[in-house]
Amino acid sequence: FMYIFIDAENSQWMMKFSMFILTVYLFFSVSRIVTYLFWLPTRKKKWMSSGIAAGSLLFIFFLYSALVTRTDYKVNELDMTFSNVPTGFDGYKIAFISDIHIGSMWNAENELKELSEIISDINPDLLVFGGDLVNIHHSELTPETLTLLSRIKGKDGSYAILGNHDTGAYINGSTPELRVKNIEMVRSKLENAGWLLLQDSTVYLKRGNDSIALTGMDYSDELLEYKHSLSSIRGYDVSKVYKTVPDNIFNITVSHLPQLWYSLCDGGYSDLTLSGHIHSMQFKLFSYSPAMLMYDEWSGLYEREKGKLYINDGIGSVGFFARVGANPEITVITLKRE
């Protein structure tokens, strides 16, 4: 509903206002419900006091998730072993981030500055971004934020794909022409920041005589139909994206939608798929999340015979200004040869 009144001119402040109102409403409503759940069974005063205490503690926890957890970056490091990783890429380090949602960051410059410093310390060979850089409109990419994005990089470059929010699909009155313009502006601004946008295209990374392929799935109008799909997308034709990619080369595919993994695996195209999109619904406690009830794959590492999938929990937030246990994530993957 919050997108109804959002257009190109008011996208940032209107989204932040809507998210703030929704966040306050959720915090107070849930805390109040907990208070009454304690009191209703017996309707005794002592249980009302216990309910007030429980509701207050819950409210404090929610407040912590908005003020602290939301920007408390977590670095997840993992080794991934493959039999077909070339010798030259044994030990190759990839920093993977996703879903920045710049337009709904409370203080984008401070948050991006901290992110750039963490990734600079990691000093990865490659920087990969999994889509949803902006929230509504390309105007969220200001000269200041682009300068900070230019500092987020890998030694072999920085590569990005589009997410559903980057397409302009959420602007009130969005048209195909408006979406094309928004995508072109996002691409142009990314290039100015030193990031290369992959749109159904592949680049080849080299180490001596060895090479691997990095493929980026574009977020086409056809995929927009699946932007809120809960089930895995099977039978989607991805073959055109890999027409010029050699069959025997180790391939990393970046797809904003993790639901595409089955189509990628069934075709034998991707050895490692990197995705975002779900954010663990910004609620994850002790590895449990509402997302696990809705999606086949929702966070972390998944494996099938034909490939692996890693879903990053994202950096920014959308809908409400909080990350309840679901810290913003920087994934550091080190490739290992079996």
How would you describe each model-predicted region?
Residues 88-338:
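Soluble catalytic domains of enzymes that build or remodel membrane lipids, polysaccharides, and related
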